[in-house]
């Protein structure tokens, strides 16, 4: 099986730590970091999950690096803050979109296409519609 994944992606960063006091400067908790993890998020998460199942997978995603950093109190396992960096991305190239619509991206034919749209600007409604109309096995997950 050969699957094409298209969509917005990000790096999901989790900073875990301990909160023992409030800041004297403002009514906010002070987090002492103890651990940090990073994973692919959004369409990268779909791609990584398919790869883990030994599925041949290709990812088309944004070049701009979107980072979602979550700060978590490990004592209560509660997120206390999320910081988003570079939250938007450029649209997919028209020539690339036409190759996808013709199901011939990189001279490959795909058994299925997964569209993972998180509304960050990489895919437009018209791009999604044309990909869906031009291919039979399309799975769409959109936040719209």
State what each model feature region is.
Residues 1-26, 33-144:
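Ribokinase/PfkB-type carbohydrate-kinase core domain
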């Amino acid at each position: 099986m050969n699957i094409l994944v298209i969509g917005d992606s990000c790096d999901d960063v989790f900073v875990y730590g301990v909160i023992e006091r409030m800041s004297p400067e403002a009514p906010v908790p002070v987090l002492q970091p103890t651990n940090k993890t990073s994973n692919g998020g959004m369409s990268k998460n779909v791609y990584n999950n398919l790869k883990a199942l030994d599925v041949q997978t290709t990812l088309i995603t944004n070049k701009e690096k979107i980072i979602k950093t979550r700060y978590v109190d490990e004592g209560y396992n509660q997120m206390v803050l999320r910081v988003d960096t570079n939250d938007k991305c450029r649209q997919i190239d028209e020539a690339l979109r036409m190759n996808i619509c013709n199901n011939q991206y990189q001279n490959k034919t795909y058994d299925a296409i997964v569209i993972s749209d998180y509304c960050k600007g990489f895919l437009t409604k018209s791009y999604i519609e044309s990909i869906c109309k031009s291919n039979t096995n399309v799975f769409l997950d959109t936040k719209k």
